[in-house]
Amino acid sequence: MLRIYADLTKFGIVVFSVLAGLAGYATGFQIENPFDWKIFLETLLGIYFLSSGSLALNQVQDWKIDQKMPRTAKRPIPSGKIKPAAAGILSVGLLLVGMNMLFKLEPVAGWVGLFCVFLYNGPYTLWWKRRWVFAAVPGAIPGALPVTIGYAVANPDIFNSESLYLFLIMFLWQMPHFWVLAIRYKDDYAAGGIPTLPVALGMEKTMFQVGLYTLVYVGVALAAPMFVHASWMFVLLTFPFVFKVLQEFYRYYKSNGTERWLAFFMWLNVSMLVFIIIPVIDKWNFLFIHHN
């Protein structure tokens, strides 16, 4: 039963969302304020329930499409492990719990969470993904908002440079992340009728877009000192990951997307975590030293 629940809520993606929320909260938190474990844990739980509910609802919305795709046909609903109605009730319950927690913690965080769910389960799932080749671009907005939700609980000023940096890293990372998978499973997406880049425009144009967004992504990471406090630690830890991401993309590109996809994919994911965690460590190290 736990396995079905984990698959329905896409637990692996939820973990990324919670980690992003943690980074957002830690970046927005002011060291002069008393740290409250209750608020901290409720923030992570709120993001967990919201993400789980939204992703489960997405499977309810897409189960007929998932049924046509070999990669997704074994998901809980198309495989018959759980009824769509039961999954729908569970997803709504999770969403309500998550929204309630976030609104109680900080109304700004609640509104950002509500907008996130609306965008992901509304326009993206129901229209953009099914009709638009570049749906991954606006679809990356809700995927990047968990970090903003976490930030908002600690600091409701979500339009400052710190919050913007975290959002941009999460946003830009998603395009190469998704399109690498779209290349890998392009036959599945074609079977499901989803017009992804490799299905609709071919490999050459898709690889160009992957490369373009990868360059912008690492460019923003290198520009972090313009957005957040950054010291020698930033330089020491960021540059090797930037180099490795670009190196793996080059190898991936030279194979025309047929080899090295997993190495590039994994380094993208690891680098994203590094790029949002380094500013947190750097800021807290700086504040702690100067506070004492």
Curated annotation (Swiss-Prot):
Its EC number is 2.5.1.141. The chain crosses the membrane at residues 11-31, 37-57, 85-105, 108-128, 133-153, 163-183, 199-219, 223-243, 261-281. It catalyses: heme b + (2E,6E)-farnesyl diphosphate + H2O = Fe(II)-heme o + diphosphate. This is Protoheme IX farnesyltransferase. The keyword Signal does not apply. Carbon 2 of the heme B porphyrin ring is defined according to the Fischer nomenclature. Pathway: Porphyrin-containing compound metabolism; heme O biosynthesis; heme O from protoheme: step 1/1. PROSITE patterns: UBIA (PS00943). It is found in: Cell inner membrane. Disulfide bonds: none annotated. GO terms for cellular component: plasma membrane. It is an enzyme of class 2 (transferase). Keywords: Cell inner membrane, Cell membrane, Heme biosynthesis, Membrane, Transferase, Transmembrane, Transmembrane helix. One of its GO terms (biological process) is heme O biosynthetic process. Gene3D superfamilies: UbiA prenyltransferase.
